[in-house]
Each structure stands twice: as C-alpha cells, then as structure tokens.
Amino acid sequence: MQVNDLGFIATILFVLVPTVFLLILYIQTNKTAS
C-alpha cells in the first residue's frame, strides 16, 4: 500500500490534534476540581 507523505502527515495530525486538545481539557478540569 503506497502512502504519500502528505496523507501520512495529515492522518497523524487528524489523530494527534484532538487527542492533545482533549488531554489539555482533561488536565484543566482536574486542576480546577482538586
């Protein structure tokens, strides 16, 4: 299966960005709650 670099980077960003966003949101709520 041939995957071009742009598609590979786009896939990584598509997964990574929401994960980091949720992680920051989770940490912020934990700091506020405690």
UniProtKB/Swiss-Prot annotation:
The keyword Transferase does not apply. Coiled coil: none annotated. It comes from the Bacteria. Keywords: Membrane, Photosynthesis, Photosystem II, Reaction center, Thylakoid, Transmembrane, Transmembrane helix. One of its GO terms (biological process) is photosynthesis, light reaction. It is a single-pass membrane protein. Signal peptide: none annotated. The chain crosses the membrane at residues 7-27. InterPro entries: PSII_PsbM, PSII_PsbM_sf. Pfam families: PsbM. The keyword Thylakoid applies. It is found in: Cellular thylakoid membrane. GO terms for cellular component: photosystem II; plasma membrane-derived thylakoid membrane. Its main location: membrane. One of the components of the core complex of photosystem II (PSII). PSII is a light-driven water:plastoquinone oxidoreductase that uses light energy to abstract electrons from H(2)O, generating O(2) and a proton gradient subsequently used for ATP formation. It consists of a core antenna complex that captures photons, and an electron transfer chain that converts photonic excitation into a charge separation. This subunit is found at the monomer-monomer interface. PSII is composed of 1 copy each of membrane proteins PsbA, PsbB, PsbC, PsbD, PsbE, PsbF, PsbH, PsbI, PsbJ, PsbK, PsbL, PsbM, PsbT, PsbX, PsbY, PsbZ, Psb30/Ycf12, peripheral proteins PsbO, CyanoQ (PsbQ), PsbU, PsbV and a large number of cofactors. It forms dimeric complexes. Belongs to the PsbM family. PANTHER family: PHOTOSYSTEM II REACTION CENTER PROTEIN M. This is Photosystem II reaction center protein M. It comes from Picosynechococcus sp. (strain ATCC 27264 / PCC 7002 / PR-6) (Agmenellum quadruplicatum). The lineage of its organism: Bacteria, Bacillati, Cyanobacteriota, Cyanophyceae, Oscillatoriophycideae.
